[in-house]
Amino acid sequence: MTLTASSSSRAVTNSPVVVALDYHNCDDALSFVDKIDPRDCRLKVGKEMFTLFGPQFVRELQQRGFDIFLDLKFHDIPNTAAHAVAAAADLGVWMVNVHASGGARMMTAAREALVPFGKDAPLLIAVTVLTSMEASDLADLGVTLSPADYAERLAALTQKCDLDGVVCSAQEAVRFKQVFGQEFKLVTPGIRPQGSEAGDQRRIMTPEQALAAGVDYMVIGRPVTQSVDPAQTLKAINASLQRSA
């Protein structure tokens, strides 16, 4: 086990905002990142950017003071998923995720892989139902439950495996906080400030609505990354959340 990123080098943020980086060019991504303050948000790196630019890109972001949510949604046999999660912890990320549909043995193995990291371990979150999926999409897979019911079933399995929380839609947050408790973290994509286009997300909410629903960390992408003044956009979102708190 080798920790490659020191948490002491990062800025401390109390903001629930996680900005999704979706760039095809590393320089463009870093140019955007250099316009914003790590005290105002964390950053999410997904499959495309990690595949294109690798661990070094994550280190570049960490060196700028940002906490990183490594959104790779591991879904594999238990041993492979566990090694992947441990590799993410070695990289020093703040949060990493797996697919809850990988099952209890996979999630348990992933959690156990983080034990040696102690307090430096990242948050381990499970994905329930992708926010782009509707009931008809689940039916195509042979799942007869509604997206909300299926997500709750997967969330219950996640908590049973002692993970830190789940990725879920904002619409499920109120129910999940009631069922799973305040300590079970809810990470929600599809969050868009008032007036933003829905894009490819189907189940969306504004940041204020998400906060009221019990969302702990809200993922926001294009409304920030495509903003003329992303730093000001972030400050406005955080200010609105503080007023709503």
Curated annotation (Swiss-Prot):
From the UniProt record, list the reaction(s) this protein catalyses: orotidine 5'-phosphate + H(+) = UMP + CO2
The keyword Lyase is annotated on this UniProt entry: yes
Q: Which cysteines are joined by disulfide bonds?
A: none
Which InterPro entries has this protein been placed in? Aldolase_TIM, OMPdecase, OMPdecase_AS, OMPdecase_bac, OMPdeCOase_dom, RibuloseP-bd_barrel
The record's GO molecular-function terms, alphabetically, read: orotidine-5'-phosphate decarboxylase activity
Where on this chain does substrate bind? 22, 44, 71-80, 131, 192, 201, 221-222
| Enzyme Commission no | 4.1.1.23
- Could you identify this protein by its name? Orotidine 5'-phosphate decarboxylase
Naturally occurring in which organism (per UniProt): Shigella flexneri
